[in-house]
Amino acid sequence: MSLSIIFMGTPEFSVPTLRLLVDAGHRIVAVYTQPPRPGGRRGLDLQKSPVHQAAELLGLPVFTPVNFKDAGERERFAAFKADVAVVVAYGLLLPEAILNGTRDGCYNGHASLLPRWRGAAPIQRAIMAGDDKTGMMVMKMDKGLDTGAVALSREVEIGPNMTAGELHDRLMQVGAKAMAEAMVKLEMNDLPLTPQRQDGVLYAAKIDKAETRIDFARPARDVHNHIRGLAPFPGAWFELEIGGKPERVKVLGSELAEGQGVAGQLLTDDLVVACASGAVRLTRLQKAGGKPLAASDFLRGTPLAAGTRLS
C-alpha cells in the first residue's frame, strides 16, 4: 500500500524528504514549489528551486504558482484527489481551500520543538538564543502560524560550537525520516495528534540585515551564539580598516576564549577579541568578494596585531 501525496517545498532542506517519500513507494501526484527566480552573475537567468530540480530528475510533475488566490489554482490542487499534502519549507501561505484540499489535510515538517520558535527562522533563532536542543516536528497544519497539532517529534542536541549550517544539515535528515515515519503511521490510521502547549510560545522572526552586525559590547557567549547562529548565511560581520578603508568581514566560526579587555579589541595576534565580559576567538572569516578562510589563512593575507579594534 502507499499514499498519493502532493509534495510542497522549495529549498535544499526539503529535498531529502521528497526523495525518501519516493523511495518509500508513495505516489507523488504533484510537486509544488516556488517559481524560478532571477539568478546568475547578472541576474538574467531564471533558476529553478532545489525541489524543482530534484522533482524533474525524479520524473515528477511540477507546479509553480505565485500564490493560491486564483480559483483555478485551488481547483487544480483539489482535482488531484490526493490522500495528503506534505509541506516542508514551501514558503507560501496556504489558504483553507488548500489546507483542506486533500483527504487527510496538510502535514508540515517544522524545524523546532513547537511551540518554541514558530515562524520563518527557527534554526538560526534557536542557536542565537543559546538553546542546547531543538528538533523536528511533524504537525497537521491549521490556519495559524505553526500552531497545528503535533503528530511526531524528534529531538536534536545543539553542540556548543554548532553553526546554523551544521544544524540545518542535521535537521534536514532527521526531518526527512520523521516525515516518512509519520506517513507510514498515517497510512495505518495510527497517527494520533497532540495539541501544542499554550505556554512557551516564541516566534522566530525572519533574520533582518540590520541585526547581522556583531556587537562586541555584549557578553562573549552572546557574541559567540550570534556568530554561529548566522553562519554561513547571511553571516555575522564586523568592520575592519584595511588600507585606510573600512571593509566588511564576515565571521563564519568562533569559540569562547579566555581574556578581558576593551570590547572589540584584539587581545592576541590570533584573533581573540574582547567582549563586554570574556572573549571569543574568531576561527573562520570571509572578506567581501573572497572565499571563507580559516583564521590562520586569513591572517597570512591580513596580519592583525593585538590592540587592533574591530567595529
Curated annotation (Swiss-Prot):
GO terms for cellular component: cytosol. One of its GO terms (molecular function) is methionyl-tRNA formyltransferase activity. The keyword Protein biosynthesis applies. It is an enzyme of class 2 (transferase). It catalyses: L-methionyl-tRNA(fMet) + (6R)-10-formyltetrahydrofolate = N-formyl-L-methionyl-tRNA(fMet) + (6S)-5,6,7,8-tetrahydrofolate + H(+). Transmembrane segments: none annotated. (6S)-5,6,7,8-tetrahydrofolate binds at residues 112-115. It comes from the Bacteria. SUPFAM superfamilies: FMT C-terminal domain-like (SSF50486), Formyltransferase (SSF53328). Its EC number is 2.1.2.9. Keywords: Protein biosynthesis, Transferase. The keyword Translocase does not apply. HAMAP family: Formyl_trans (MF_00182). Attaches a formyl group to the free amino group of methionyl-tRNA(fMet). The formyl group appears to play a dual role in the initiator identity of N-formylmethionyl-tRNA by promoting its recognition by IF2 and preventing the misappropriation of this tRNA by the elongation apparatus. Belongs to the Fmt family. This is Methionyl-tRNA formyltransferase. The lineage of its organism: Bacteria, Pseudomonadati, Pseudomonadota, Alphaproteobacteria, Hyphomicrobiales.
